[in-house]
A protein has these predicted regions:
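Bacterial N-terminal signal peptides that target proteins for export
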Residues: 1-8
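Bacterial signal peptide processing site
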Residues: 21-23
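Forkhead-associated
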Residues: 63-128
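Surface-exposed beta-loop interaction hotspot
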Residues: 132-199
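Flexible, glycine-rich surface segments
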Residues: 177-236, 241
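C-terminal motif of bacterial Sec signal peptides marking the signal peptidase cleavage site
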Residues: 16-19
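Extended, aromatic/histidine-rich regions of cofactor-dependent oxidoreductases associated
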Residues: 161-167, 236-238, 257-259, 263-302
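N-terminal beta-hairpin/loop module of FHA
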Residues: 32, 36-84, 234-235
Length: 302
């Protein structure tokens, strides 16, 4: 092959390569709005890294009725990670009452006070009991009729490895006004979860909105200061998490208008850890719409 043909081949290859590389769009919106979303995203990253964030979960262990010994030794009913004492103690589950008894020679703390025998409150009571030894923290969760130990390690390696979550370019066009359509009475909707079970929840109404000339509707769940929405769309399993994303909104205004800002839609905790118990979108909240806003997939899960 002569030199001129080689040069033509190189130029053609470069042209094809450059034309296949799409430049990501610049943020779209007022400077104030763009700054607001950037600040929201930064705070989201900070929350994930906290001791109470989702990044440091290292275990989820379901309890059986009766005694449940736990620690790093294989002789326990529940094996904790190797950086824990061989036997930490025992959790006794009897008729929904949970009691902790520590093993001899192990310092277990509750609110920085050493405890040897303590009644435990689960996470649904609003006054959950958290215990600690070394860098480990654990408490009881209740899901359906089951109780489990949720374990954290505040020195988990992922805290150092985690840097950020990719997001779509901020676009104020994805800040959409929806109409709240109340259900009277509130409708019971089925919410599946990652554990393979389904629970009922009250939906006070649906949120109806228009995008690209088409109408869409999402069933909302009541939250403390507005609504909580679990949804999936045509990016799910491709660019975003396959099991959907979460979105919070404010309460409806006097005209029953609710703002859906998909730029702050975010990944469920199951993206970051297999030890979370995430709800999944109800089937009616799967949208035939590509929502290119908010958080993208993190890691290798889809």
């Amino acid at each position: 092959m002569n030199l001129s043909k080689i040069i033509v081949l190189i130029i053609t290859t470069l042209f094809i390569s450059l034309s296949c590389t799409e430049k990501e769009p610049d943020p779209k919106g007022t400077p104030e709005y763009i700054a607001e979303i950037q600040q929201w995203h930064q705070k989201r990253i900070e929350r994930l890294k906290r001791d109470t964030g989702w990044l440091n979960l290292v275990g989820l262990y379901w309890l059986k009725e009766g005694e449940n010994s736990f620690g790093s030794s294989e002789e326990n009913d529940i094996k904790f990670p190797d950086n824990s004492p061989p036997k930490i103690g025992t959790i006794i589950l009897k008729d929904s009452l949970l009691t902790f008894k520590s093993a001899d020679g192990v310092d277990v703390l509750n609110n920085d006070i050493k405890v040897t025998d303590l009644e435990l409150k689960d996470d649904l009571t609003g006054t959950r009991t958290t215990l600690a030894t070394g860098s480990l923290r654990w408490y009881i969760i209740k899901r359906g009729e089951r109780y489990g130990i949720r374990l954290r390690d505040v020195e988990s390696p992922i805290l150092k490895e985690f840097k950020d979550i990719d997001i779509y370019p901020i676009n104020e066009d994805w800040r959409i006004e929806a109409t709240f359509i109340p259900y009277d009475p509130p409708k019971q909707i089925l919410i599946p979860n990652i554990l393979g079970t389904t629970e009922e929840d009250n939906s006070p109404g649906s949120l109806s909105f228009t995008k690209n000339g088409k109408n869409y509707k999402l069933d909302a769940i009541e939250s403390r200061n507005g609504f909580f929405i679990i949804f999936a769309d045509e990016t799910s399993g491709k660019e975003t998490y396959g099991a959907g994303r979460f979105l919070y909104t404010d309460e409806p205004d006097s005209n029953n208008i609710v703002t859906l800002d998909f730029n702050i839609s975010y990944n469920p905790p199951c993206v970051f850890t297999k030890y979370a118990t995430c709800p999944l979108p109800p089937k009616q909240n799967y949208l035939h719409l590509k929502i290119t806003a908010g958080e993208k997939m993190w890691g290798e899960k889809h």
